[in-house]
């Protein structure tokens, strides 16, 4: 596990250098939207949670518009365990029956989201929580999961959705009024059902629709790793396809990297996978020139 950066040990002169280094990036991203997929340890360790809240407040203060899409897998697992249910995953997607969907809505749209909003507001920011059902934000359709063992057939994984369309009006309205949107990845379908959507997929689609300058996806590893455990700092579409094919990218990383690549192909100028276990990883990625995590390229 990466050692956290101990900011208390940084000298005043080095802090001044860091601030000076950030100025060109503040100018570059001023007035631009940055979508952040927030998840993993950064959502469960108190030190990292507080650091993240301060980071997004600082981004807003210097004129950058952060939009947060959060996950909550561990919290959902804990809630399911309390009612005697075991989480099941297929190709990185949670199988979601009706009872599980009720838990997902309660945990993501309630407990997890409000924790994030409360912490940002506590430190002086102005955050507003939304689900994809608010303001018609995320229109969803049922996800048909291809059966890898039976080509041409599909596996029913319940109320799991994919993004059919995004109406960004409510997000733009919040940005115009200087709020920080915090979005739970729950969509609504024409059938009247709620759908559990992978947060990585929502973040990628939202970044595209908002014409975001950058998409940052936080995870619990340094970035995309090869089979020997080495960090891959820069990946093209062709290289990613090869990593899918040989199984290097698997499980929960499948939707994350697929979404990141789709966003890059759709015009999001900068897409990065970063280690959320490192304190202030979002600021390090956005406001410094230090190579950090894995950059995803469309070509």
Swiss-Prot record:
InterPro entries membership: AceGlu_kinase-like_sf (IPR036393), AcgluKinase_fam (IPR004662), ArgB (IPR037528), Asp/Glu/Uridylate_kinase (IPR001048), NAGK-C (IPR041727)
UniProt-annotated location(s): Cytoplasm
Family that this chain belongs to: Belongs to the acetylglutamate kinase family. ArgB subfamily.
One Pfam family linked to the record: AA_kinase
This protein's UniProt keywords: Amino-acid biosynthesis, Arginine biosynthesis, ATP-binding, Cytoplasm, Kinase, Nucleotide-binding, Transferase
Residues holding substrate: 72-73, 94, 196
Gene name of the encoded protein: argB
Pathway(s) of this molecule: Amino-acid biosynthesis; L-arginine biosynthesis; N(2)-acetyl-L-ornithine from L-glutamate: step 2/4
Annotated site (Transition state stabilizer): 37, 256
Protein name, UniProt field: Acetylglutamate kinase
Reaction(s) the record says it catalyses: N-acetyl-L-glutamate + ATP = N-acetyl-L-glutamyl 5-phosphate + ADP
Organism: Burkholderia thailandensis (strain ATCC 700388 / DSM 13276 / CCUG 48851 / CIP 106301 / E264)
Gene Ontology terms: biological process: arginine biosynthetic process via ornithine; L-arginine biosynthetic process
GO molecular function, one term: acetylglutamate kinase activity
Role, per record: Catalyzes the ATP-dependent phosphorylation of N-acetyl-L-glutamate.
Gene Ontology CC annotations of this record: cytoplasm
EC number(s) stated in the UniProt entry for this protein: 2.7.2.8
Class in the EC hierarchy, top level: transferase
Chief location category: cytoplasm
């Amino acid at each position: 596990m990466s050692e956290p950066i101990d900011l208390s040990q940084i000298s005043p002169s080095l802090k001044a250098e860091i601030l000076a280094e950030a100025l060109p990036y503040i100018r570059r991203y001023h007035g631009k939207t940055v979508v952040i997929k927030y998840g993993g340890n950064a959502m469960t360790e108190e030190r990292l949670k507080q650091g993240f809240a301060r980071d997004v407040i600082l981004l807003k203060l210097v004129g950058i518009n952060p939009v947060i899409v959060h996950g909550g897998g561990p919290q959902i697992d804990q809630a399911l365990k309390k009612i005697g249910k075991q989480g099941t995953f297929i190709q990185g997607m949670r199988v979601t029956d009706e009872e599980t969907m009720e838990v997902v809505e309660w945990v993501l749209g309630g407990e997890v989201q409000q924790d994030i909003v409360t912490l940002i507001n506590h430190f002086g920011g102005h955050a507003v929580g939304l689900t994809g059902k608010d303001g018609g934000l995320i229109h969803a359709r049922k996800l048909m999961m291809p059966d890898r063992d039976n080509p041409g057939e599909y596996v029913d994984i319940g109320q799991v959705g994919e993004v059919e369309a995004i109406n960004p009006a409510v997000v733009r309205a919040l940005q115009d009024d200087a709020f920080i949107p915090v979005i739970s990845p729950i969509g609504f379908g024409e059938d009247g059902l709620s759908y559990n959507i992978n947060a990585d997929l929502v973040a990628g689609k939202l970044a595209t629709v908002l014409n975001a300058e950058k998409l940052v996806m936080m995870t619990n590893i340094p970035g995309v790793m090869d089979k020997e455990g080495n960090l891959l700092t820069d990946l093209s579409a062709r290289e990613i396809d090869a990593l899918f094919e040989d199984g290097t990218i698997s499980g929960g990383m499948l939707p994350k990297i697929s979404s990141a690549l789709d966003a890059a192909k759709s015009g999001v100028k900068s897409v990065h996978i970063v280690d959320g276990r490192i304190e202030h990883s979002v600021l390090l990625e956005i406001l410094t020139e230090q190579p950090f995590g894995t950059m995803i390229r469309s070509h």
